[in-house]
Amino acid sequence: MASATRAVFGELPSGGGTVEKFQLQSDLLRVDIISWGCTITALEVKDRQGRSSDVVLGFAELEGYLQKQPYFGAVIGRVANRIAKGTFKVDGKEYHLAINKEPNSLHGGVRGFDKVLWTPRVLSNGIQFSRISPDGEEGYPGELKVWVTYTLDGGELVVNYRAQASQATPVNLTNHSYFNLAGQGSPNIYDHEVTIEADTYLPVDETLIPTGEVAPVQGTAFDLRKPVELGKHLQDFHLNGFDHNFCLKGSKEKHFCARVHHAASGRVLEVYTTQPGVQFYMGNFLDGTLKGKNGAVYPKHSGFCLETQNWPDAVNQPRFPPVLLRPGEEYDHTTWFKFSVA
């Protein structure tokens, strides 16, 4: 059984409100989540010796999250990932979003779901956050009611996303936690062994927008169906890192997505999801300038993300899984992060 407690995390400037921190605890995990961006700020898990380490990158104070930073631990919306040139059409009408990652719109825009205060509700074994995204917010059509629920069950953190729209709008919600199973502050993730259950992936152009091709992983650097050690794999294939969508086996039921094993500590993270894709990102843009928890710095490749999602730019790609939510429908997706030791 898990328990949930709450405390003040900080005050937003100019009377913007109080940010609370919620701590979920089970016999195997401890997770801290704040109401700013539904952000996971800490996640403590034991190694095979029974020693606990915090395995997510982030900050000890609210100020860290208010500065320019790469979405550490946050919920991303209204649409995660990139929309080409920040434009799309719904039912013949064209919409224009802010270009916040030239020349595209990234992760919901200038002030996405990661940069707003959510309303919390404590549950017996978790916490539910809700907000209403007004019609026209960041250029998106229609009002969107959103609920994000975190629950803890033993070694498993479950994240459920629900949304209802007043008019047709693209919706694609994810969590942008950066993990390092050696413990946050460890210099890199090269000794992590990764498996991703995907037969195909999406090649991208130089601005990281999918070309439209769905390419087989067979015989490429993207074949992660059997475990690979990241450092050696990058060297073998002369890669700068991953920042790609892997296409999961298309079922709306819970399915296996990825497994990461850190041999030295014994920690294992398995990810399951109802989503059709996962963005595997290796922190290629981290550059060591941000000061994190306990004086940690976060250089390139010091954390990895497994962002379960619909495929990037799906709103402009008719052959990709549908991303539009219409009135009367409910967006409902769940991702499971399961921690263990091996």
Curated annotation (Swiss-Prot):
EC number in record: 5.1.3.3
Active-site residues, record numbering mapped to chain: H176 (proton donor), E307 (proton acceptor)
UniProt keyword annotations, A-Z: Acetylation, Carbohydrate metabolism, Cytoplasm, Isomerase, Phosphoprotein
Superkingdom field: Eukaryota
Matches recorded under InterPro entries: Ald1_epimerase_CS, Aldose_1-epimerase, Aldose_1/G6P_1-epimerase, Gal_mutarotase_sf_dom, Galactose_mutarotase-like, GH-type_carb-bd
Main location: cytoplasm
Protein's pathway: Carbohydrate metabolism; hexose metabolism; Carbohydrate metabolism; galactose metabolism
SUPFAM superfamilies: Galactose mutarotase-like
GO MF term list: aldose 1-epimerase activity; carbohydrate binding
Protein's GO biological process: galactose catabolic process via UDP-galactose, Leloir pathway; glucose metabolic process
Catalytic activity, reaction form: alpha-D-galactose = beta-D-galactose; alpha-D-glucose = beta-D-glucose
Cell compartments where the protein resides: Cytoplasm
Modified residues (N-acetylalanine): A2
GO cellular component: cytoplasm
Pfam families: Aldose_epim
Matching CDD domains: galactose_mutarotase_like
Binding-site positions, beta-D-galactose: N81, R82, H107, H176, S177, Y178, D243, Q279, E307
Keyword rRNA processing appears in the UniProt entry: no
Disulphide bridges, residue numbers: none
Record family assignment: Belongs to the aldose epimerase family.
Function per UniProt: Mutarotase that catalyzes the interconversion of beta-D-galactose and alpha-D-galactose during galactose metabolism. Beta-D-galactose is metabolized in the liver into glucose 1-phosphate, the primary metabolic fuel, by the action of four enzymes that constitute the Leloir pathway: GALM, GALK1 (galactokinase), GALT (galactose-1-phosphate uridylyltransferase) and GALE (UDP-galactose-4'-epimerase). Involved in the maintenance of the equilibrium between the beta- and alpha-anomers of galactose, therefore ensuring a sufficient supply of the alpha-anomer for GALK1.
Oligomer and partners: Monomer.
Protein name as catalogued: Galactose mutarotase
Provenance organism: Pongo abelii (Sumatran orangutan)
Designated gene of the protein: GALM
